[in-house]
């Protein structure tokens, strides 16, 4: 799903949980800061879903789990390497995997996460890639350049999720005073 930043990723998960389309959701992000941001949003908007931050917590009783790709790979691999092979999450543990910022760093290295879990896969991005070695569309089995759905800026503004953009003029020093060669550093 192509959607602008701030257009309601938390709301999407909320709707799917309320509609009983899924019981347990794995929300993946590529940075710890995004994991923390998502956990805070889920706690604020979905407190009954008992969001679990898999980067810092070991709980397994939530409905929404949030993790980075490396943390989830570690959880999958650690279980496979453990004595007895008991994994923390079985292949059917999650009904839905939501991939935040799906255009970044998920192509070859972390594709094993999607192969391991038997779950529906939803990718969220504002800027899908359509390159030979990094194609967001092919990762989700889509025709290049054709997302499943797109939620544009105008739609998000009309629904009240986003404020309309506002241009602000910010005069910079070099625009006011110009640039003189002798003032430039060697770098």
PLM regions and their residue ranges:
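SF2 helicase catalytic motif II
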Residues: 70-71, 84-123, 127-128
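Inter-Walker segment of RecA-like/P-loop motor cores
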Residues: 43-84
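Conserved helix-turn-beta segment of the N-terminal RecA-like "Helicase ATP-binding" lobe
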Residues: 21-25, 32-57
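Hydrophobic residues on the short alpha-helix immediately C-terminal to a glycine-rich phosphate/catalytic loop
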Residues: 12-20, 38, 113
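Substrate-gripping "pore-loop 1 plus following alpha2 helix"
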Residues: 78-95, 104-106, 134-151
């Amino acid at each position: 799903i192509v959607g602008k930043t701030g257009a309601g990723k938390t709301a999407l998960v909320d709707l799917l949980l309320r509609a009983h389309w899924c019981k347990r959701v794995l929300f993946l992000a590529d940075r710890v800061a995004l994991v923390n941001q998502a956990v805070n949003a889920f706690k604020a908007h979905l407190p009954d879903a008992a969001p679990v931050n898999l980067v810092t917590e070991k709980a397994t009783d939530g409905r929404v789990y949030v993790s980075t790709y490396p943390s989830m790979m570690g959880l999958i691999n650690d279980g496979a390497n453990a004595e007895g092979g008991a994994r923390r999450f079985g292949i059917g543990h999650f009904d839905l995997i939501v991939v935040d910022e799906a255009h970044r760093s998920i192509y070859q290295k972390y594709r094993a996460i999607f192969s391991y879990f038997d779950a529906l896969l939803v990718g969220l991005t504002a800027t899908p890639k359509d390159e030979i070695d990094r194609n967001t569309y092919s990762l989700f089995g889509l025709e290049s350049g054709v997302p499943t759905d797109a939620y544009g800026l105008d739609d998000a503004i009309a629904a009240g999720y986003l404020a309309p953009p506002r241009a602000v003029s910010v005069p910079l020093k070099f625009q006011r005073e110009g640039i003189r060669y002798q003032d430039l550093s060697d770098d």
